[in-house]
């Protein structure tokens, strides 16, 4: 196979070198587990087996391999099996809407969903996105994201995910997945795993920025931290039935994420019981044999480098089976996993071809964009897929607003004599809402950050527009200055304003775009575009200054948040197309703010720990990013080091007040945990593998330049691969057990979707009474934290929450449960979850540091 023999040797050599050089090491785990169709996957699995059994080898390979960058209409597209009616599958970004399209919605970012703490809204957003993807003819949505989790507050893509807390992320991750897949589209849980920064994620990208590295960054983590922090939300995703997982660019303990047998074979497929397929991130595929045996099921976009016409899969995967390097059962399993996901979401009933092109807005163009080949046809049908989704977008935008501070300034009455709207972030991008490719600039109001995780706006309501409409209703005066450097005019407007509304922001994004020296990751946590000076100027001239922050995460506010003239602070995140309307709803009291901050607001950057690697530290080899902090990120770190935050995790004010009382705890299940034992079934093969002559290019096929095909040029396998080293001894480099299809031992922590079913048995029922003691209706989020009791554990960790709506004077009893996973730690020796003998205490309140109710749990096992 082309490059694969060399790559297998390199992998072995790298493992030895890693051990010798005392670098982090990822132990091998083989063979790659085969799907068995357990639980809710049963019917889809049976259908997948039936159809795959009818496929030839090259038809199976066609499902596993993208056709190449810009070769079809979508950012990723597989081959098809027309003989059996199986279409080419369209894969398209992003986690917040359809990228590179038109007449689609631009949804709030994942971080805003986290700020709502609302499971229903997470599901509704997922369902609405799924409907739009389906209506555009997209089969696989490349989202949602739980990687990055948010280890470092300045990580460039944190906003695509939810929160640095794994429990909050896991719940909302799962609800989003359910919504997408209930709309008939395969969801993709990404980026798996430890993809926590943009610096050094790709060699070419880093070299373009002047860094002389030859391998991508290695995220080095211990087993306990992996399970208790970063793997946690992916377990929730698997339990929710996610159809696809995208492996990441980075290395994990010096093994690439898309050929790391421990993370793919052991953790994801064996331990968590994942039944869907693993796809590579775009060009994160580094080998043929190595990746296939380590658990990679689909290569995206198919070519080794964009538009190269070469692939680690395609023809080379066909050759790998024919020469015995890759067992037939492994390719059969790849195809079964892909088709099972397809059937599970009902895509076969809803499938339509893509009605748009990612590469042009022209109505007509060549069928194959990059080589300008194939039929000249209608490539864009301009189908409007927005439906009524503006309603849920606006609601999430408003419900995600976090009222950080309110000294009586809010809500506004609408009768203010003069309202000043100050700051570039209130206005429009002079180039238009979509004027910067993939939103790669910070111009005008910030409603989404930058990168492949974006969508085109159908429109963007700015704060200036929405607030002006409000002021004019009350026949007041409204003056706006959206030039952050026009200090004189800002001061003039502020001095005559009854209330000054200051809009500031901080942006970030994906590493292929450099915005103002920010290579994806933020250079610092300060406000952008002179934001601090705008606030300073306004507070010097107006004693009623309300600051609205649109940002990708925390920013430093210590110099001004306590200023007596700052009477209100709101964090509005990245609210999408209805941005202005959403913030106006909150400012004018139509919506009572109920958002809670999904991250901690520290006094300094140092408060968070130095967790972003910005300079190579391993010569020109892979930069080594050591996760020495373990599970202590965000509020867990603040608690450990007794750091006092400005606003703690989970904080958020309301226009009303609430009281929590009456904590009750009941043991509902005292059964003991039973580790999984026994063996899997043997790997199955479906259909026969013929000799090489059966897999030659079909006669009369007109080949498309650079298109990735599964067929052979010749029955001479070496000639078909073009690999000059083909035929050299390579079985000594195949990892031990990698081709073994016999029954395998089951892992103790395995046994069902998301792991051992015993982990999800409810042990305790907890109830609390919440009372609205104020004069207006509002939402409160009771939060349950657990102290696991060990000397090296966080003081407390979030485990349960619920957003509740209460009328004035109304009481509600919130009842939740705690399962075994909620109370357990990962035992690195037993390789299983264990409830330790340390005392377990629960705390219930309205933030991580406002916890008025507490109770000790009886001991369970």
UniProtKB/Swiss-Prot annotation:
GO terms for molecular function: beta-glucosidase activity. Its main location: secreted. Residues 735-754 are annotated as: Disordered. This is Probable beta-glucosidase A. Gene3D superfamilies: Glycoside hydrolase family 3 C-terminal domain, Glycoside hydrolase, family 3, N-terminal domain, Immunoglobulins. It comes from Aspergillus terreus. Beta-glucosidases are one of a number of cellulolytic enzymes involved in the degradation of cellulosic biomass. Catalyzes the last step releasing glucose from the inhibitory cellobiose. SMART domains: Fn3_like. Its EC number is 3.2.1.21. The active site is at 281.
